[in-house]
Each structure stands twice: as structure tokens, then as C-alpha cells.
Amino acid sequence: MDRASELLFYVNGRKVIEKNVDPETMLLPYLRKKLRLTGTKYGCGGGGCGACTVMISRYNPITNRIRHHPANACLIPICSLYGTAVTTVEGIGSTHTRIHPVQERIAKCHGTQCGFCTPGMVMSIYTLLRNHPEPTLDQLTDALGGNLCRCTGYRPIIDACKTFCETSGCCQSKENGVCCLDQRINGLPEFEEGSKTSPKLFAEEEFLPLDPTQELIFPPELMIMAEKQPQRTRVFGSERMMWFSPVTLKELLEFKFKYPQAPVIMGNTSVGPQMKFKGVFHPVIISPDRIEELSVVNHTHNGLTLGAGLSLAQVKDILADVVQKLPGEKTQTYHALLKHLGTLAGSQIRNMASLGGHIISRHPDSDLNPILAVGNCTLNLLSKEGKRQIPLNEQFLSKCPNADLKPQEILVSVNIPYSRKLEFVSAFRQAQRQENALAIVNSGMRVFFGEGHGIIRELSISYGGVGPATICAKNSCQKLIGRHWNEEMLDTACRLVLEEVSLSGSAPGGRVEFKRTLIISFLFKFYLEVSQILKKMDPIRYPSLADKHESALEDLHSKHHCSTLKYQHMGPKQHPEDPIGHPIMHLSGVKHATGEAIYCDDMPLVDQELFLTFVTSSRAHAKIVSIDLSEALSMPGVVDVITAEHLSDVNSFCFFTEAEEFLATDKVFCVGQLVCAVLADSEVQAKRAAKQVKIVYQDLEPLILTIKEAIQHNSFFEPERKLEYGNVDEAFKVVDQILEGEIHMGGQEHFYMETQSMLVVPKGEDQEMDVYVSTQFPKYIQDIVASTLKLPANKVMCHVKRVGGAFGGKAFKTGVIAAVTAFAANKHGRAVRCVLERGEDMLITGGRHPYLGKYKAGFMNDGRILALDMEHYSNAGNSLDESLLVIEMGLLKMDNAYKFPNLRCRGWACRTNLPSNTAFRGFGFPQAGLITESCIMEVAAKCGLSPEKVRMINMYKEIDQTPYKQEINAKNLIQCWRECMAVSSYSLRKAAVEKFNAENYWKKKGLAMVPLKYPVGLGSRAAGQAAALVHIYLDGSVLVTHGGIEMGQGVHTKMIQVVSRELGMPISNVHLRGTSTETVPNANVSGGSVVADLNGLAVKDACQTLLKRLEPIISKNPKGTWKDWAQTAFDESISLSAVGYFRGYESDINWEKGEGHPFEYFVYGAACSEVEIDCLTGDHKNIRTDIVMDVGCSINPAIDIGQIEGAFIQGMGLYTIEELNYSPQGVLHTRGPDQYKIPAICDTPTEFHISLLPPSENSNTLYSSKGLGESGVFLGCSVFFAIHDAVSAARRERGLHGPLSLNSPLTPEKIRMACEDKFTKMIPRDEPGSCVPWNVPI
């Protein structure tokens, strides 16, 4: 046994040898910090986002095969990599050598925006292609199931994937026996001149071919080592931990005997997150990944024996092969396992996690254990004392001592028996998201009839997610033995199971009534499945299912993704080299795909750099009694702990009307408030020390978390805002009907893929400070840092190359973090880096404001709304931040597309004990618009009219005035509405939906269409000014810089297009380095959909200034080149640099009068969405979405369509699955992708069609273009209202005809519980106040 083992592996074809390996080191930081391969990104640290995906390759000398699989680098201990080859995004291609076809296609198909997730996407696709050079679309979408993107909406990524399929342009799903390529494009009609309809925005014939022979080979040295080098046990150790990797089963047993408490890990997908997130520490780790006996696959006459070391992906492949070869009656359990293996985690985790690890971990929401438990599986155990076999039953799953592994035992293999004739096994699960999400409830069920006539001989039912362990309803099953399989038995079974599988009202995870309902809904599904099989086997003996029940057995509508894009086509008069209006690729797209794009934390380490990490409050409202820093300061590598006392008189900064503390002084007002900051030599040391800071609190009253609690305590920020138009009170006197209602809307986490990141570097002279930061607002960072350091702003320079997503979340809270980081750097004269972990980021930074909307509407029987009185309440959190502006924008935009002749709307920002909420894409409109649309829905229901008819009746239709007296021309609004009606075939599909609903009791479809009027502008001229700087060099090349931030919206690409048009030179001649307060001072925040508008006009101004100077030179030498002209200008002492400036639009709003001109123009649009829901589980699927948008004249249709799609998917997440959970004490439960679910590739519409209106004049803007970044978020509510329509259909069929009020997000829980039926009535209900709930609806 080597006591000081060397670690040898390969990275991108290069040998790596490490002599002093720390077993706690994961591959991700090793790649990024040690090898400087920064293309692999940190996104969450827990394997939930896919940003750190790499390919791991291993050679098996026994099979003589190389296995490639994707893996999450954040979870891979480098000690486990001996003898492997690691391939990162840098290893498959680069701009310096040759880019790989995967990299090229994802870039040219416009599959990148901010680009932070792109390397992970690339590596997932690449790994699949190494194993399957011509994959199916199913394989590709499955490969991307573990990768998240917050920007694109996934459609262009899917398009890039399709190019590798054998039939790349086809959706691979024939309708009426005809390929989609042989039909008209998804039934879309041809449109007028000026538009082009296409399924794609790229030229596939330009792509590099995929050539498997050109891939990086597996290192021959590793093959020789595996075949010829004697295998030895390897030992790696540090001061804190030892890592043992035995080579034989005997050695493994010896280690386990010596270290009985040491965990045995294969993929580190369970132990790793526990150590990282839950503070669990193991001084000894045993890794048996080379032991052959743990990878056994034996076929016996009784069933399969699978080695505990097999990965879940390998188990899936083995079972898929078995079910193809064996008769169905033998493979019931295998089919059930395959069903859950298809959705369990993502491809990376399935390839890392082992079968044995999944079983032994015994997570209460395990997807496989309930199936294995009912399948009579047994576990083969081994220790130095000998072999033992135990059943995988409830006693084992609940860790009963007499049924568990002994500390010195290991799990060698699992026996999974064949099913028998007349034995049926099924599996069920429901999660917040369809794939890569832990189950809320899951279940395995088995019944055996023997040779009886439908009489139950054996019955097993197990549930996960409903207790601290998997629960088996053993007593219920025993009481049902001997019963006939009929509805009477079902009713008894439901009652018995509900009694046995009881859930406390305060059960962890919440959703208690939903879980109780799922328990018996799954049982009902199982009953129907078995009944249908029995009927098919013996139609005479067994009765047919009632027609209405058949739909319960069908999966939700699902086909392969397909899309069409209708975009503007440039006219014949435009110069062929003019790039404006062309779908030009994001100019950083290839760098995103190769990993060469540099983000803040990708910057190299600075000499003597320190790392800063924050200590945050664990109480929501408390007095700080004491802070003990002694233990933290005594730890190795710790340099300092910064407190409010150090900051003293610079411990606050005034954002708008009130100052906010950086670090808490004597009180805390939310969980997650910054208390102090630890400085250490490394990130690891800083984080360990932060855990040792001891803070004593004394709780204070009141604790206010919700809007209703704020109203009760009169806890508001000043001032109240009010908008009034017409005479509301008089109008209420003349209407036919009046209704009152309210809707609550939850918040939303920004979930930008790149967390808050910065590096502050003291320059060493004149007190200068460079701040490299991921922010939307460099000027603000400059101001707050300068103020904190008591320096003039000219000593602080803020630099932003690019931002890995922001959505409003990287402005003001980023400034607080930067101020403390800069203070630390200034105090110690050393560079300081601060990068928040995902959980810290979600805890500290706040997000979209939760809203409560109350409305009173007066309307006529024909649907005309004559009076509307509204109240808007936002949950601002503990400080004002931008909450007042959010309320103001919500009020100004609440009318959406409708003319309300008499309107009164008031808004309040509620002060609560939550982290301060802030700006978020849409800035109040997604909330305010939903309130208005909910009112429209209720008016329609009262009038007996369709919501779409009521929408059209009340819509702006011509030149009119908004409630704040700004003129509006609604021509394009009506055109969007009518075209959306046409392209979506709304009337035909509405009839089809009604027909479907009439024929299906347990599945329902819904169809909804919403209009959009989105005002664009910042409310004041000062906020809309912009500047740019353009240099022409003597070789004729151009450098441009401007005040806008590139955060995925493509503003830099558009600015280069502007320079190209104005100066008449190719795009390749123009370069843009980034944004800096050094080159463009005093730039406003990048947001509000106006970044390209404002900065583009400044760039245009600078270019025109240069052209005017150079006009005499160019006219004398019209055939010259830019190099010639630049040299001549230099020789004649003509400046080749110009500053461009735009003053901003004339904007204002007088809140006292409630009138003004706050916006420059309006974006119009419409969206139609169709969904299908499962009434028994609350699951839903977005079948199709059609969006029509007015974009004026698009500067770049590829970028604009990307913004529309990305915003829509983000909005869809907001209104459906994204749910923040807080404890009654104000602690955020949802702190990462495991708990908080943003849309994944499985959530995108099966059909996604985008249409841009033909070009239209928008005279005051850049080339008549319109900003689109924010408006599309609201269109996601078309999915919300389609679900509402489906739920309403279900309720009507069940005799429930009253008003339906559904809050947002419309999660599976809310959908299921709104579809009331006999099962929802059967469950026990907790009396209000009888228990303390796990979570509080914020």
C-alpha cells in the first residue's frame, strides 16, 4: 500500500501528476485555480445546474472498452480521478486552434446569450456525441436534462442539437403520417412582404462536419497502466482527511473494519453535498471504484443481480436491454425502475451516482427505493465476518438497527427479482419540475393475484417524500389481502392508507394536503392501470374501465420540440454589407462555447490576493448581543474579520431616500443580513473561519414576513403612490355589475448563472483602486466604493468585461458587497476577491417583489369595464432599495393593453423582515399585469363571455391616452392580437380543446391568449443619457466603448453593427473591449430594455462626428481604404477619436397630478399558449406557444427573438414553477437548484413559434428599433391562464361553477388542489392554528 500515493491523470491530453493531494479538493476548483482552465464554471456547487460539466473517460482492461460520461466537476474529488482522462471545454477546441462542431453550432445557432452556462451545455452534447455520433433527439434532450440556462429559453440550443441528428431539420414526430418538413411550416400562413418565415436563423450548410476520427484520443499511457501496471491500494491524505482507494474486495473489507464509520463513496453525489452544505465532516473516506465485484451483472433464474458500484446510468442501460429481451410479465419491476431512472437527476448525476449509494443513502425522497422495496429486492452484504443477505424493506429504509448494515459491512450487490405472471408493478412521482427535480411524493406499488380471479394475494405500497424515510403501508396492504380488485377495494384502500401514512401539518417540505392527495391519487392510478391490464387479459371476467377514467392512464401530451420563426427581411434598397437587420451571431458566441470568454472570477489570481466571505444573520429581527471573533481569527490563513465597528462612519450609503447599512451594527432585520466579513488567504480558509464566528441574538418583536402582516402592523415605506383617471366613484353607480377580488403573487429568484463576483485591486499609488465586478451599474459601484474609502471618484475605476446574467439583480446589492470588499482591500493593501456561493447569493440579494393585488371592477353585461379601483402591495423586504420605483412602474403599466375610462390605483411598498427585494426584469409589470388580467378573467366569467372577447372589447384600438395622459397609438397592438389569433389558429384549437375536455375526465387542456402593451423608458431624461467613445487607429481598425453592460442581451454585438453601418466598414474591423468608468464616465444602469437604444444613439453620434471630420479626406480619395484615410487624417492632425453623446428622451411624471410623459414608446405583442394538465397530480405540459411581437425595425432579429423567448420562459417559470419558501422564522429554504426550480429543457413548449411584425417606424429610436429585453416576461402568464382554463374545465365537469381564484405561481400543488374531486375531499384537514407550518406563503 502506497502511503504517499501520487495522483496521475490526464486533462485535455496532458499528464497531471500531484504529489500532495488534499482529499477535500474537488475537480472544479482544481481546474480553475491550479490548471487555470476557467471554461468550466461554478454555478451551484451541488451538481444541480450543469455549468461545471466535463467529460470523464475511463479504460476498462477487462472489456477493453473506453467509457466516456459527463460529470459535474463540482462534486468530483480529484483523488477519484487516478488513471482517468478529463476533458474540459478547452480541450475540444479553441479559437487559437480549431473550434469543435459542437462549439460552432451552439454559437451560430444563437444558443448563447450571457454564455455562462454554455461550456457545460457544450460538454454535455460533446460527451453524448462521443458515445453516439448520430444521436436521436430524445438522446440529446436527455443529455441536456442536467443543464440549466436562464437566458435563452432553450429553443436555439435545441436547434443546435438537432443539427447532429440524422434528420436534423425534422421534429422526428410525424403527424398524419407526414414529416413536418413536407408540410407547410407548422401550418403558419405566409405573411406580407417584409417578413420571412423559417424554422431557423442560421445556415446549416456552413457548419463544420462532425468527424469522430479527429477527437482527442484516450491517452495510451493510461491504457498501458491499466493493463500492465500492478494495481495497488492508493492513499491520499491531508491534515484533516484520509482517502483510501483499495483495489481488492478483501482490502475494502479491511478498511471498513478499521474505519467502520467511514463512508464508502463512488460518485460523491450524496456525501459531497452533505459535507458542503450541511457541515458534515468525515475524516476518512473509502473509495472502492476499482473493485470488480461491485460492478457485477448476473442473470439468474430468479432475476437480476446488479453490483452496488454500477452507476445509475449503467443500471438504466442494463434494464433497458433486459426489458427488450424478456417477456413483459417478468420485467414489471424493471419497467417501473426505468420510468423513474429517466427523470432522476440529470445525465451527469446518473453517470456519477451508484446504485448502492442511492440505496444506502436512504433519502426520504429516493425515487428508486420505493420500487425496490415493493419489488421484494434483497441486499447482499459482506464484511470480514462473512456474507449476509437482508431484505430491502421498511425496516431497512427506516434504519432499524436489526435490519440495517452493520458499521463494518458493505453492500456488494442488489437482487432484483423477476415479476411473475399476474404480478404488476408501477411507479409514480410528482415533482415541482418534470425532470431533474426531487419528488414531492413518489411511490412504488405491486400487486400479485396468483391464479385467483382478481383476488389480491400480495400487495405492497411504498411512498417517498412523506416522512423521514420511505414509508411502506404494510398494515393497509395486509388488510386488503383476499379482497377483489374493484372500486370497493379502492375506497377501502384509500381510507386505510391515509390512516397509516399520516402526515403532520408541520411536516418538513410543507405541501401537506397536496402530499396527502397524491398518496391516494397515485393509488387510484395504480388501480386503473392494473384494471386495464386485467381487462385486456380477460375481457369477459373483468369489467371495462369507465370511459372517463381512461385518460388517467395516459401520459401528458409530449412530442419532440419544433419551432418556427417569422422575422423581418431586409429590403432590396439596403446595402448588402450593411449588417443592420441581419441575424448576426452574438460576437462572443464562439468564445462562450470554447470557454475563452472571461468572467470576473476567471481573472488570474493577483499576488497576495485575499478572499472575503460574509457572515450573515440567522435571525429575522433581533438585537445583536455579542459577536465573538476569537475562534475565527485564530484559524490558519485568516487575516482579519471586518465588522461595522471597522467601517464606522462609512458603514452606510444612501440609495434613494434612505441610507442602508453595509454591516449590521446593533440590530438585524432579516435572515441573510450582512454582519461581518472574514478575510483569509484562500476561499476554503475564509469559509471555514466564517462558520466559527459566534453571534448571540435577542429576538425582537414584531416579526413581519408577509404582506398581510405588514398591512396589519401598518408597516410601509413612504410615500404611497396613487394614479387616478376619470371619476371612479361615479362610474360605479352606472355599471351593470360590480365584483371584488384579489390575487397573490410570489417572488422570484434572479438565478443568474454567474453569482455575485468581484475582485478589488489596490494600485499601490495615489490611493487608486481597480474594481473588476459583475454588475449592471459600474458608475454606482464607483460611487459607493469611493464614498466608503473617502476618495474622489477619479481614484476608483470600475471595469466590466461581461456579466453572466443579471436581470436586475446586479446593481444595488452588488454595491454593498463591493463597498465592504473594497474597504478590506484598502485596509490591508492587498487585492481581495469575493464570489458568493449560490446559497449565499440567494439568501442575501433578494429578488422579484411578491405582490398582493386587490381589485374592484364595475362593468357592463357586454364585458365593458367602466370602473376599476385597485390596490397594489409589494413585499419590499427590510430596506427600500428600488421598491418605490417598482411600485411606480407597476402603477404606470397596470392598464396593460386596456382602456379603462375610470381608474384608481394605489400602491404601497411593505416593510418586512425579509432580505430587501430589488429590480427584476419587467420591474413591477409582471405583477401588475397579472392582477389586471385576473380581473379581466373574473369579469369574463361573470358575463358568461370568453376572456379573449372581454380582452378585445376593452383593448386600446386607436390613438388614445393612457391613465397618465400620454398619447398612445394602438395600431400595432391590434395587429399583434389579430395576427396571433391567426397564426395560432385560435378558434380551431379552442374547439379542439373543448372536444378533448369533453372526452377526458382526468386530463384537461386549456388555451389562453393575452395581449401586451409594454411602455419603454426610464421616467426621466437624466436616467436616459448615454455616452460612447470611438477610436480609429492608423491601420483602419476601430475600437468602440460605451456605457452599456453586456449581460447576455447582445448590446455589444448591436453596437458593433451600428459602427459598421455608420462607418461603412465590415464588422470584423470593429472591436469592443468592455465597459469601464475610465473610458465612459457617469453611465446609467443597464436595464429597462433601453441599453441598446441609448448607447446605440451615442455610438451613432460618435461615428457621425468622425465621418464629418473625415468627409473631405474620403471625398478626395473615395476608393481608398480606412487605413489610407486614417493615415491621411493623422498626417493632417485631424483627431481620430470622438465622444458620442445622447441626452436622453424627454421624460417626466408628476405624481401629484398623476400625469406626464414617462415613456418614449410602447412595445406591443400577444401570446397564445395551450397546456395539458393531469388533474390527479397537478402536473402540466406546455403544448404550444405562439408569440407575435412588434419590434419596430429589428437591428438583429436573432438577438431580438432570443430576448423574446428567454423572457417568455423566465416569465413562464415565474407564473408556474418558481416558488420561494420561507420558514415561519424568516429563513429561506430554497437556496439552490435542488430546492428552487427554474424552467429546464423539459419545460419548454413542445411547439414554439415566434413572429415579428413587419418593420414599422419608431422615429425617435435607433433605426426605428425597440427594446425587447423585459416585455416578454409578462407573456409567460399566457401559460398561467391556459392552466386556469384547464382547471376551470375540470371544475365545471365536477359541478363546481363558482368563481375560481388561483394565485401565482401556479404550481402542481395549486393545480391539483383546485381540481377538487373525491380524493381531495377524502384527505384529513388540519385545523387552522393547530400546528406550526414548515413554510409561510410570502
Swiss-Prot record:
FAD binds at residues 264-271, 345, 354, 358, 367, 411. SUPFAM superfamilies: 2Fe-2S ferredoxin-like, CO dehydrogenase flavoprotein C-terminal domain-like, CO dehydrogenase ISP C-domain like, CO dehydrogenase molybdoprotein N-domain-like, FAD-binding/transporter-associated domain-like, Molybdenum cofactor-binding domain. The modification Phosphoserine is found at residue 1068. Detected at high levels in liver, also detected in lung, kidney, lacrimal gland and olfactory mucosa. The keyword GTP-binding does not apply. The active site is at 1270 (proton acceptor). One of its GO terms (biological process) is lipid metabolic process. This is Aldehyde oxidase 1. It comes from Macaca fascicularis (Crab-eating macaque).
